[in-house]
């Protein structure tokens, strides 16, 4: 499974972005719970979800600060 692209996160509306952040946090919690109980078969999913969450939070922060990236960035 490839790493998610930040362009995908930037294409979301503000409401979709908030919903996606909530969904990824919930999924990350469930993955950590599975890891703690030794039921996690695909441990790489934790890394992918953390990466996606970081991208989503970065985009949210950019929007709050009013910074809109250009195509060169």
Curated annotation (Swiss-Prot):
Key words of the record: Ribonucleoprotein, Ribosomal protein
SUPFAM superfamilies: Ribosomal protein L29 (L29p)
Gene Ontology terms for molecular function: structural constituent of ribosome
InterPro entries in the cross-refs: Ribosomal_protein_uL29, Ribosomal_uL29, Ribosomal_uL29_sf
GO cellular component: cytosolic large ribosomal subunit
Any one Gene Ontology BP term: translation
Pfam family, one: Ribosomal_L29
NCBIfam families named in the record: L29
HAMAP family, sorted: Ribosomal_uL29
Record family assignment: Belongs to the universal ribosomal protein uL29 family.
PANTHER family: 60S RIBOSOMAL PROTEIN L35/50S RIBOSOMAL PROTEIN L29, LARGE RIBOSOMAL SUBUNIT PROTEIN UL29C
Name assigned to this protein: Large ribosomal subunit protein uL29
Organism (species): Synechococcus sp. (strain JA-2-3B'a(2-13)) (Cyanobacteria bacterium Yellowstone B-Prime)
